Amino acid sequence: AELLSKAAEAVDGRNALILAAKEENYKQVGAAAGLAYKQVVGAESAVDINLAKQLNVLLTQLGVDGKSIVMNVGSAAAGYGFEYAVSTMDRVKAAALAQGDATLQMPIITPVASEAWGVKEAMASEADMPEWGNQEERGIDMEVETAAAVLASGSDAVILKHPVSIKTISTMIKELM
């Protein structure tokens, strides 16, 4: 929390997203990033609609403007609990839009890179799994597949690692617009 507070201070006057306020540190991060320096606060919860909503409520009760909150409702790489993460995202979007729940109407950002590059398909070396092909290409594939799927499922933004993944997803978004 202290590092995030210092980061918010360092980018004072700029439009920055400070990741991540969690249940255990939302007061410090929310106060520094959202209140003192008027930054956007990333609210990170486990893959659970109720926890996401609760954190948004806590941040807004602290005084952070709801328009300055971006939710991270959790993620998983494609094939690794991904369906549960997507169903949570679907429920968040349904409650926000269909039911008009203002506490869930914040944009969603999904940190794809940390999930996609941490699975065995991306981590196994070519020496260990030669039949799987090039390790870097596998990581890129996992990142692109997961990013495309979460964007289709309601995420408003993704965090990617590899330049090829960024280019591929950027192209996909431009072609869909």
Question: Residue locations for each model-derived region?
Answer:
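N-terminal active-site wall of soluble small-molecule enzyme domains
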Residues: A1-D12
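Active-site catalytic pocket residues across diverse enzymes, especially alpha/beta-hydrolases
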Residues: V11, A96, I173
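Short, well-ordered coil loops that connect the C-terminus of an alpha-helix to the N-terminus
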Residues: G13-R14, D65
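Short hydrophobic/aromatic-enriched beta-strand-loop microsegments
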Residues: R14-A20, V40-A43
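Catalytic alpha/beta core domains of metabolic enzymes, predominantly
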Residues: E24-S165, I169
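Short acidic, glycine/proline-enriched helix-loop-strand junctions
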Residues: I169, I173-M177
